[in-house]
Amino acid sequence: MNITKTAMITVCGRPNVGKSSLTNALVGEKIAIVSDKPQTTRNRIYGVVNRGDTQFVLLDTPGLHKPRSRLGDYMVKVVRESLSDVECAALLVEPIPHVGEPERILLQRIQEEQLPCVLCINKIDTVEKKESLLEVIAAYNEVYDGFDAIIPLSARTGDGLDELLRQLETYAQPGPQLFPDGMTTDQADSQVCAEIVREKMLRCLDKEIPHGTAVEVTKFSEREDSGIIDLDVTIYCEKASHKGIIIGRGGEMLKRISSAARRDIEKFMGAKVFLQTWVKVKENWRDNPNFIRSQGYNEE
C-alpha cells in the first residue's frame, strides 16, 4: 500500500457517547473496550485506518467529565492534550437537541486550538423520526457556527462512516506513513489483554466497583511447543469488600469474568490462551500518584 498522506484525528465527546465504538468500527476490529458505563476509556488510544493513499490515526479519548480523583484528573488532562497537534476534531454527540456542559467545554477548547471540527451525531439507528435530527443540528449551530461538516452516523450499524472518512480525508497532509501495514493500534498486546479483562468487569459488576479496579498483566509468554499464550493478570481493587464481590461466592464471579475475557483475548490474539487471574486490595489507588504512574497513566 502506497501511503502518501496522513491525518491525525481526535475523537472526543462526553462519556458513553460511543467514541470507542466509532474507533473500533472505523479500524475494523476491536482495539478499544466498550461498555455501557461512563469512563470506560482511561487513556488515549491510537487506532490506525489505511484507506487508499491515506493513513488515518484516530485518537480515542476518555469522556470529558468532572474528575473525582487523581486518575480522573489524568483522564481530563488526556482529553485536553489530545486536541493539540492534530488535523481535526471529530466531536461525537447524542441525537438529542441539547448541548451540555461537556460539549460546550470541548467546543471552546477546539476553538482555542483553531481546529477544524466535524460534528458527528451518533446513534441515529435509535432515532425513529429522522427529521428530528434537524433540531439537533440547529441546537449545535446555535452554540457553535464553525463546524466544517455535520454527519449523522451510527457506529453500531456503520451508517455514515464512509461519509465521515471522506470528510476526514480532506484534512490529510502529505507525509510518510506513521504506522506499518497491518498495525491497527499503538497498544502492546499485553495492554489490550488487560483492557479486555477490565471491560468484562465493567459488564459483569454493578455500580462503582469496576471503576475502582486496575488490571496489570504480570506474565505474557508464548509456549514454543504449542503456541499457547500464558497470561497472568492481577486485578487491583480499593476495598476488601470489593475483592469479595469480584471473586464472588465460590469464585463464580471471577470465573465468569475470566471466561468472558479469555474468549475475547483468544479472538484478538488468534491463539489459545491459558489465563490466570488474582485479585488484590490496593486502598485508594486512584489517588496514589506512584501507583497511577506504574499502571501507565503518566501525569507528567
Language-model features, listed with the residues they occupy:
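Conserved, well-folded catalytic cores of nucleic-acid-processing
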Residues: 29, 48-52, 67, 82, ...
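P-loop NTP-binding site
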Residues: 189-300
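Conserved G1/Walker A P-loop phosphate-binding module
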Residues: 1-88, 93
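Solvent-exposed alpha-helical segments within well-ordered globular domains of core cellular machineries
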Residues: 10, 24, 43, 47, ...
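Conserved C-terminal guanine-recognition region of P-loop GTPase G domains, centered on the G4
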Residues: 50-55, 77-150, 221-225
